[in-house]
């Protein structure tokens, strides 16, 4: 029963198909506003479906089409179709393929809208009534006339034929490949097809034959080297050859000649080149010449001449990109039509055909951009297409107007068209318009070079030829002027120093040289011709200041990129733009000394200005020592204070005294914060385990001590700050200041005699000694010291209260000292600011006419306790005396009774707050000092100090050092280290950075390194395919298949150095095995090189 039912359903399906046909095939009616279509059920459904998936952007008339399935392959069908009311007018169409998806999109004549779409998977087949509906994956597509070839991921090649009315049929199915089809190409007609597969073979199919077997099989090697792309060279047909190019995963470019006599099988290419390191993913042949462009995973685009008359093994031109290149294509049409802007000159096509065609490339790893390059300016993209989603594939579109259009496929299901001539497309950028006309860069010798270049005057052949044109009358004038300046030349040459390369002073009207006293002069601006020679302009000494204006009537020569432009070996070449060369052997009739007065030369091409600035502080030895020996992390057993002191000693060893003092100041500040119980106590080192071992009783005792000291310390700090401000104001206005200064010096001397830490070095040494102890012992001693100070503070307070209560008119007590000092200008705050001052010091405060009588009539005994926490630079501003006077008058007027105390005593008892009730912040706190030191270092350009501080303190004080600042400093520092070839220091900086900073730095500076080894004799790339596949044994970089010679042999045993090799010396360059050299030098006790070069190693 089941068989008749199934047979009936199949017949019903066939009957329905014969009535309605394929909806997509019959839906070939254009839009209603263009031509009135015939009314039919199929056409109406097709229009609804087309409008559902296609959309048109009205801003820039961009064609967009959204598919219902994932797409990955793209091609263009150039065959006239008569669909609906179009009678052969639709000549350019799009073929899109993907996962179970293959459609033909009929595009309008203006290529701005989709007229109809045809589902090729529903086409008729010569093998069955309908093509198979199994799940297929179209990996590549190629078209020729009315034929469409589709390469599938299962190794099958399907051939479709499209009729003029839009209907299609499967006419061929070939399945001789075992893996995915990566590339397809037709040979001169629609009857011969090439297919390159992942299985490492290229097969030639005859589509006219009834056989499904290939006519020829091509293989680059005996092993299966996957083929990424292959293409037939139409230029070889002139020499009656059938040339095919292919690129492989091994990085090889192979050239095959299909005229073989080996029975339809080719196992070796005619020629083979290794242009890339790693897999080559794409190739495309130039439309006019025998040049091929290839792109690979090594982020390079190579342009190579594969003709028979060339013998080069390296690319003719190389373009470095920022990502792996997955697709590369020459443009379809030459650049004969350019958009001319107001500031751009109308340029004619370049006679070099390579410059007339652009190169477009797309990138791997889901990159959403397509870059368009031109070999005339290959260092920067001409245009960049920015897509909203990653680009899957692209082609240059052909059209009737020959405009520059690119069709793209974006992941997962979007087709878009971009017009590169359109100036209003926001998704197409032109990087050259965003760059400045003047650029500069530094080299490793602390010199820089500036280049001024017009935006659209680059590599103009006609301009280079015009520069070399000569005029005899100008030649005579120039030579006479040059001979008149001979004396000036010799005097100028004698005034220079005796250095190997003497550089003249840069005399330009707009240049300021702040260092005129140095004997090393900056070279003059160097103008270059198209051939790379210097363009000499003889001028008189009096007119040397008008150099920037000497090219107003004639153009400056253009910048050519060759190896000679970076080297200047004589002083005459550097004096070319200022004064004529002194040597009489110069040929003034040579082209580089002649000018051109043509109006074509009014443009100003690139102008090179090398400048040498002697900066004494920028020393290579100092930079290398600071970057190598400065600690950027905390080693085991050290604290942060120790690290700061070590960095201070490193800076002092290179006479960088200010940086050394800053490091010492940070160390003292960190120690001070630690002693005052600040939160920065944790930055002194990873000692949490030791702290946890302290008994509970000690913690409780410390807590009580800190609580008891908090109020007294605040009062003591207030007394110190108020007294310091009061005494300073008193010294500036009092007539008896010398007596006060003398007495104050006695107090200072008394403090210095009682404690040896009265200067900065003693404080640093003490901080270093304290930090070197263990945390337990240090804190126990700290507890005993604080308890002792607490008792002294309590006794001192009781004594003051007793004096102020029972002896209101008692004089101020003055502590005597047997010695006297003569330095009367010593600051009064020195005795009050030392870290380990005595418990109390008596100070005499004489009266002055500046203050009121009430303040001076009732002096009291004021004793100031300078404890451990009365540190250096703790001068918070106190309320002025006028504030106290106003408060006193207000209290008197209100009848408030006050004790007969002096205004200074009341001021000293005030809380350490301002008028708004906010606590005063010390400007010399650790965070404040750190921020100020970083600001100054950044202003001075001290990148080493900024980077070192960022590595040490970024995770400790994130509110002081922002993430942006840390990244900026470390990035600049790493770039400078890499430029100076200090790679170990650069890697150490990345390793010592915090996790979030390290992750971002690794993305920028820790990329994979690719090494390419070349033969030291024949300069060929060491691939060794012959040795690998012939079974001769292991061969690596020590052997070359091209010249059959070993590369590196041991100088002692004459065997290949396959592993670790030791170089005897940099002068002789001989190398050998470690064991061999150990036997020669250590066991045999030889001192010279075993190679016989008489080089004394020891």
Curated annotation (Swiss-Prot):
Instruction: Return the InterPro entries for the record.
Output: WD40/YVTN_repeat-like_dom_sf (IPR015943), WD40_repeat_CS (IPR019775), WD40_repeat_dom_sf (IPR036322), WD40_rpt (IPR001680), WDR24 (IPR037590), WDR59_RTC1-like_RING_Znf (IPR049566), Znf_RING (IPR001841)
* MF terms (GO), sorted A to Z: zinc ion binding
The record ties this protein, via SMART domains, to: WD40
Q: Where are the WD repeats?
A: 131-170, 176-215, 222-266, 275-314, 367-417, 432-473, 635-673, 891-934
Family indicated by similarity: Belongs to the WD repeat RTC1 family.
Protein purpose: May be involved in a process influencing telomere capping.
The identity of this protein, by name, is Restriction of telomere capping protein 1
């Amino acid at each position: 029963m089941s068989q008749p039912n199934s047979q009936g359903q199949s017949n019903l399906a066939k009957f329905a198909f014969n009535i309605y046909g394929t909806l997509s095939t019959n839906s070939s009616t254009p839009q209603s506003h263009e031509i009135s279509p015939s009314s039919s059920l199929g056409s109406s459904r097709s229009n609804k479906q087309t409008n559902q998936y296609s959309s048109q952007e009205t801003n820039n008339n961009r064609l967009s089409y959204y598919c219902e399935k994932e797409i990955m392959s793209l091609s263009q069908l150039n065959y006239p179709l008569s669909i609906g009311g179009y009678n052969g007018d639709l000549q350019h169409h799009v073929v899109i393929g993907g996962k179970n998806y293959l459609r033909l999109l009929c595009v309008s004549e203006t290529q701005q809208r989709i007229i109809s779409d045809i589902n090729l998977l529903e086409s008729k087949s010569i093998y069955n009534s309908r093509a198979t509906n199994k799940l297929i994956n179209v990996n590549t597509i190629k078209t020729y006339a009315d034929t469409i070839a589709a390469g599938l991921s299962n190794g099958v090649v399907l051939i479709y034929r499209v009729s003029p009315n839009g209907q299609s049929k499967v006419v061929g199915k070939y399945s001789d490949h075992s893996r995915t089809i990566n590339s397809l190409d037709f040979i001169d007609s629609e009857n011969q097809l090439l297919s390159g597969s992942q299985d490492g073979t290229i097969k030639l199919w005859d589509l006219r034959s009834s056989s499904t077997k290939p006519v020829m099989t091509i293989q680059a090697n005996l092993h299966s080297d996957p083929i990424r792309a292959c293409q037939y060279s139409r230029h070889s047909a002139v020499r009656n050859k059938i040339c095919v190019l292919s690129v492989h995963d091994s990085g090889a470019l192979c050239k095959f000649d299909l005229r073989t006599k080996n029975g339809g099988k080719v196992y070796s290419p005619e020629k083979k080149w290794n242009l890339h390191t790693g897999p080559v993913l794409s190739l495309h042949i130039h439309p006019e010449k025998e040049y091929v462009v290839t792109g690979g995973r090594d982020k390079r685009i190579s342009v190579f001449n594969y003709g028979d008359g060339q013998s080069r093994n390296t690319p003719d031109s190389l373009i470095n990109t920022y990502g792996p290149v997955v697709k590369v294509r020459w443009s379809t049409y030459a650049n004969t039509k350019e958009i001319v802007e107001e500031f751009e000159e109308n340029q004619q096509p370049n006679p070099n055909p390579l410059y007339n065609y652009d190169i477009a490339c797309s990138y791997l790893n889901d990159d959403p951009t397509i870059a368009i390059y031109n070999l005339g300016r290959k260092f920067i993209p001409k245009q960049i297409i920015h897509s909203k989603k990653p680009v899957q594939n692209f082609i240059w579109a052909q059209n009737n107007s020959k405009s520059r259009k690119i069709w793209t496929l974006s992941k997962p299901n979007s087709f878009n068209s971009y017009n590169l001539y359109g100036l209003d497309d926001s998704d197409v950028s032109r990087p050259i318009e965003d760059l400045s006309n003047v650029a500069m860069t530094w080299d490793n010798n602390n010199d820089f070079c500036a280049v001024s270049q017009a935006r659209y005057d680059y590599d103009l052949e006609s301009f280079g030829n015009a520069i070399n044109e000569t005029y005899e009358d100008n030649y005579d004038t120039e030579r006479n002027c040059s001979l008149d300046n001979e004396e000036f030349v010799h005097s100028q040459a004698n005034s220079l120093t005796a250095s190997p390369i003497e550089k003249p002073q840069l005399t330009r009207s707009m240049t300021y040289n702040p260092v005129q006293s140095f004997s090393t002069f900056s070279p003059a601006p160097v103008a270059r011709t198209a051939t790379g020679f210097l363009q000499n302009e003889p001028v008189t000494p009096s007119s040397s200041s008008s150099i920037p204006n000497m090219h107003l009537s004639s153009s400056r020569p253009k910048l050519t990129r060759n190896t000679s432009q970076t080297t200047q070996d004589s002083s005459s070449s550097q004096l070319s733009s200022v004064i004529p060369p002194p040597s009489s052997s110069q040929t003034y009739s040579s082209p580089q000394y002649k000018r051109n007065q043509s109006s074509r030369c009014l443009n100003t091409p690139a102008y090179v200005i090398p400048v040498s600035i002697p900066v004494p502080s920028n020393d290579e030895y100092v930079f290398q020592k600071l970057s190598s020996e400065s600690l950027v992390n905390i080693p085991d057993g050290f604290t942060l204070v120790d690290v700061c002191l070590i960095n201070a000693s490193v800076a002092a060893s290179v006479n960088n005294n200010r940086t050394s003092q800053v490091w010492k100041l940070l160390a003292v500040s960190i120690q001070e914060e630690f002693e005052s119980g600040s939160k920065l106590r944790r930055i002194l080192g990873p000692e949490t385990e030791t702290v946890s071992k302290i008994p509970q009783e000690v913690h409780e005792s410390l807590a009580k001590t800190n609580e008891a000291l908090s109020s007294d310390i605040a009062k003591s700090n207030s007394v110190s700050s108020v007294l310091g401000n009061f005494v300073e104001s008193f010294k500036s206005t009092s007539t008896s200041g010398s007596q006060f200064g003398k007495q104050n010096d006695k107090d200072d001397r008394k403090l210095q005699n009682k404690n040896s830490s009265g200067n900065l070095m003693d404080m640093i040494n003490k901080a270093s000694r304290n930090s070197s102890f263990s945390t337990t012992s240090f804190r126990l001693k700290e507890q005993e010291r604080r308890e002792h100070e607490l008792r002294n503070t309590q006794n001192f307070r009781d004594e003051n209260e007793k004096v102020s209560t029972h002896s209101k008119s008692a004089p101020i007590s003055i502590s005597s000292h047997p010695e006297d000092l003569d330095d009367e200008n010593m600051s009064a705050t020195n005795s009050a600011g030392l870290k380990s001052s005595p418990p109390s010091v008596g100070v005499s405060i004489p009266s002055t006419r500046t203050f009121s009588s009430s303040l001076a009539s009732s002096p009291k005994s004021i004793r100031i306790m300078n404890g451990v926490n009365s540190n250096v630079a703790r001068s918070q501003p106190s309320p002025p005396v006028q504030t106290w006077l106003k408060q006193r008058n207000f209290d008197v007027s209100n009848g408030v009774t006050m004790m007969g105390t002096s205004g200074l005593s009341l001021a000293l008892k005030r809380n350490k707050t301002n008028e708004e009730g906010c606590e005063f912040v010390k400007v010399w706190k650790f965070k404040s000092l750190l921020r100020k030191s970083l600001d100054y270092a950044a202003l001075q350009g001290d990148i080493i100090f900024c980077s070192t501080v960022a590595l040490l303190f970024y995770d400790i004080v994130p509110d002081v050092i922002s993430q942006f600042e840390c990244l900026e400093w470390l990035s600049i520092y790493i770039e400078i280290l890499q430029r100076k070839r200090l790679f170990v220091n650069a890697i150490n900086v990345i390793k010592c950075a915090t996790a979030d900073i390290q992750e971002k730095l690794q993305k920028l500076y820790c990329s994979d390194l690719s090494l390419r080894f070349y033969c030291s004799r024949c300069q060929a790339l060491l691939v060794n395919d012959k040795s690998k596949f012939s079974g001769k044994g292991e061969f690596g970089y020590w052997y070359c298949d091209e010249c059959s010679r070993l590369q590196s042999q041991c100088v002692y045993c004459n065997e290949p150095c396959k592993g670790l090799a030791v170089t005897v010396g940099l002068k002789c360059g001989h190398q050998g095995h470690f064991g061999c050299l150990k036997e020669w030098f250590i066991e045999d006790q030889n001192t010279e090189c075993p190679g016989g070069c008489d080089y004394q190693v020891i």
